Amino acid sequence: MVIDIAVKEVLEIGANVHPQAKQIPGWENARVLTLDIDAEQHPDIVADAAQMPLELENRFDGIFASHVLEHFSYWKTDEVLSGWVRCLKPGGELHILVPSWEWAAREVLSERPSPAVLPHSFAGHVNQWDVHLAMFTMRKLRHLFQKAGLSVTHAKTMTYQIRVGDLGEFPAEEHYICGVKGTPELKKE
């Protein structure tokens, strides 16, 4: 019997103060490095995720980014994703979460929009980097992943709770998508 004891090395982009990468199945025992542009968050690597350092290329078994991609210009997201993919080893996985543009649009057009739509719009931010410059449909995410050389293995829309200042927590929707570098598409959820 062969036991794989190799420790995976994963990168969490924009981890802030609450890293989440170890919640990904199979990554529970991974060595997680964090990357953030804001040194005050105390990441392992201080860098702009739109310009990944060359020394990170082909290094990681996986990359996780929760609510990060929407902070880049819509016109640069394909370039940003390509940079992240360059940091993956062949067969490496990219997992991202982004706010659902479909959900935000429904809320904005409803008679009584949820206060949760504010943080997903282009308002309500806390620092110079916390600005949404893009929103995504699941269709657009699939296109971006495929263009970056990833085979989509999982894609789904989920509900989660978001805190809106002193107003409390409200339900919102986000898209989750996972792709693998250099393998054929496996399934659609």
Identify the residue ranges that each predicted region occupies:
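Class I SAM-dependent methyltransferase Rossmann-like catalytic core
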Residues: 1-5
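Conserved SAM-binding loop
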Residues: 8-106, 177-182
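S-adenosyl-L-methionine-dependent methyltransferase catalytic module, highlighting the catalytic core
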Residues: 74-85, 93-187
